[in-house]
């Protein structure tokens, strides 16, 4: 079973906050819930994420329980939430040590009031750097509904590879069965892309 994010980060000597060019990332705390709820409760947000939170308290408990969310600030303003869910890779013949904590799923949600400023792309790059450089995973995936053009553009901008579009693989709350898209990147690809910049 994968190591919880904050425990893995601590074991690797990671100190928060994480800093990107304009953004600061910290582990989600209960005190962050009101600001995050203010945008996650909007249909224009939850219709593109993993679900509709029933209340601010439900969002708080879900995020704290998952332990994989990072609050994203520009200055003192909460502008979004990032996700880094570390996972064990599948390994033939059962669990093997080199498969432990070997991959991660990343995700992002940006407050629509902050859209159009490049925060999504900056956040995705920061999450990739955190996963590869700080946590030491070898593979990162990101998933989205196939018609979520803004997220797909972000994945492409940061150099993630489109690995597949899957017909009607996700049951949406209001739209029924919808297609999903998966993008991924290997640590070697990430480090190679840095040398080309």
Language-model regions: role of each:
Residues 1-44, 69, 73-197:
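Acyl-donor (CoA/ACP) binding surface of acyl/acetyltransferases
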Residues 52-74:
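Active-site rim helix/loop that mediates acceptor-substrate recognition in acyltransferases
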């Amino acid at each position: 079973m994968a190591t919880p994010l904050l425990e893995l980060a601590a074991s690797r000597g990671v100190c928060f906050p994480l800093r990107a060019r304009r953004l600061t990332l910290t582990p989600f705390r209960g005190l962050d819930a009101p600001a995050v709820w203010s945008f996650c409760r909007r249909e224009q947000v939850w219709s593109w994420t993993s679900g509709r939170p029933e209340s601010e308290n439900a969002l708080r408990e879900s995020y704290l329980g998952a332990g994989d969310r990072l609050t994203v600030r520009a200055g003192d303003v909460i502008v979004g939430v990032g996700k880094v869910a570390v996972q064990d890779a599948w390994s033939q013949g059962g669990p093997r040590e080199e498969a432990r904590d070997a991959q991660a799923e990343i995700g992002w949600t940006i407050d629509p009031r902050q859209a159009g400023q490049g925060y999504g792309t900056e956040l995705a790059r920061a999450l990739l750097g955190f996963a590869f450089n700080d946590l030491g995973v070898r593979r990162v995936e990101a998933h989205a509904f196939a018609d979520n053009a803004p997220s797909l553009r972000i994945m492409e901008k940061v150099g993630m590879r489109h690995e597949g579009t899957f017909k009607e693989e996700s049951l949406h709350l209001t739209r029924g069965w919808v297609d999903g898209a998966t993008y991924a990147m290997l640590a070697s690809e990430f480090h190679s892309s840095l040398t080309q910049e």
